[in-house]
Amino acid sequence: MKSILLILILSAFSILPSWGQSGKLFNTDNQLSSNLATQVFQDRSGFIWIATRNGLNAYDGYHISIMKKELANSQGLNSNYINCITQDDKGHIILGTNNSLLAFTGSEFRKIPMLDPKGKELTTYVTQVYRLRNKDIAVGTSGYGILLKKPDIQECHAMKGDVEKLKHIHKLLEDKQGRLWIITEDGRLHRKETNGKITSRFHGTEGLTIQDIQQDDFGNFYLATKDKGVYVFKNGSNVFTRIPNIGNLPIDNIYISRNNLLYIGSDGMGVCVYDPKTGIVQDNPLFSRLVNLAKSKITSIIEDNRGNIWVSMLQKGVFMQGNAQNDFNYMGFRLGNRNVIGENSITSLCVNQGDQVWVG
């Protein structure tokens, strides 16, 4: 039995490369305004923006600047509860809060009125701000559907057509064909076709509670579910099929890196990485000496323009893992359910005549 255990350890060493150094953690002990981070975003100039439930944070590579409504540098900011971030075609940072839509010009925050069909201003929880290919900003709301902000108009109006019947929006994705995929708060998947019609039935999604959707460079779609793992809709296929290797993680969000690795953020079980080419899944390859990332609630994942991976978390702040890797491999708690040696300190190693490794 011990021999089997040690073989498993050696096998894990051989197939699970790790980053060569611990990353950097930002929290309330290290510059961040709140540990309740809801999204991390990089703008076109390379600045990292971090939305939290107690203020907005901007990182220039050396220092974080905090913006809160009670501070002098935050003129016009009407809420510290920031849900989501994007950037418009003019370079303004667009923010969705728990009650408003804002644009940060670099010197002040400007409220963007959200109007109902009768022209009455709405106060609503903004779930996502998403830049479309035509430069419009699609605004997902909890209760009033999808609103649109045109580039030269300083207000939002409801997206017209059949899509108006969808009121509680969770996630949006515009695909390479110009279709808009919509996940509603009840976990249902819909698609606004280019002719404005809504498709709401997709083979393979029956009974799923859907959390996120992404498309890779090859036209394949990946669908994240709450408790049944990840499904893939391959280019040219007509059905979503489950990826068995990933398992039934409680997934909140997914992200596809530039080299087409699928980063999977879960609710309480950290990050795992799936390689579609090999089918290999790495459980919690990111490492911090300060917190156990394998037990984190992940709210967003991005890759910055230097290849660093950023992860926002509820209760633990934001973590950045540099892209430098080496051939040194790891076994320990951050491998999640592939860890076979526990979380205790290692005090000794011994190799016997049969090339078995004993771990003490």
Question: Language-model segments: which ranges?
Answer:
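Carboxylate-rich, polar loop motifs that coordinate divalent cations or form catalytic acidic clusters
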Residues: 1-360
